[in-house]
């Protein structure tokens, strides 16, 4: 199986800021701030109550920045307590009579983004606070910082140099009701900006939705 398939050639549906504001009930000012912070910081966490629509908002935020609905440039995973560097970056896995070095989902996605440096890519992580960031990212923890994008570091497993592309954005999501927030990894706090997602009952988009129902 090709672990880094070529992007689909079919036409993509356009997706604009106006589409986002219609689909996701936040104000235009908050949207502009969210986009500005993500482009500057490269990494952001959407936090809010369960069911408020963080996953929905995260994907449409990516679409709006890309200007189109392109699933080839989005990767979605969910962290859990047993998620590891071997799953995320690379590690040895049983193969035949021995072990074989396998590349993880983030490594492969970075390689895909590096092949298209003029395009924006989005790596979306659900339940990001449930994983051990230092354990999962390893030496890449420094490379995801905005100031270190495109700078190279040597990977422990294969000894090759590696970098995280500048136009790869990481969007994490977490529930504010989660008890593990109190134990939030300092590495996470330092490398990500935080943005609250709340029910947008007073936004123009929601008012238009209610009027359409009446």
PLM-predicted stretches and their roles:
Residues 1-214:
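C-terminal regulatory/interaction module of P-loop NTP-utilizing enzymes
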């Amino acid at each position: 199986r090709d672990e880094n398939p070529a992007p689909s050639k079919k036409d993509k549906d356009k997706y604009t800021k106006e589409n986002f504001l219609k689909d996701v009930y936040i104000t235009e000012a908050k949207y502009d701030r969210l986009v500005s912070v993500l482009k500057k910081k490269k990494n952001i966490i959407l936090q809010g109550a369960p069911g408020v629509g963080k996953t929905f908002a995260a994907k449409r935020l990516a679409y709006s920045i890309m200007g189109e609905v392109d699933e080839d440039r989005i990767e979605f995973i969910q962290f859990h307590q047993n998620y590891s560097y071997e799953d995320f970056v690379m590690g040895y896995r049983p193969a035949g009579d021995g072990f074989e070095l396998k590349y993880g989902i983030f490594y492969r996605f970075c390689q895909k983004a590096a092949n298209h440096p003029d395009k924006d890519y989005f790596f979306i992580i659900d339940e990001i606070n449930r994983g051990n960031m230092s354990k999962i990212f390893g030496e890449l923890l420094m490379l995801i910082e905005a100031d270190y994008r495109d700078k190279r570091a040597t990977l422990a497993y294969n000894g090759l140099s590696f970098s995280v592309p500048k136009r790869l954005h990481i969007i994490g999501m977490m529930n504010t009701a989660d008890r593990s927030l109190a134990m939030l990894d300092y590495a996470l706090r330092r490398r990500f900006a935080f943005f609250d997602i709340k029910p947008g009952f007073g936004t123009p988009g929601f008012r238009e939705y209610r009027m359409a129902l009446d």
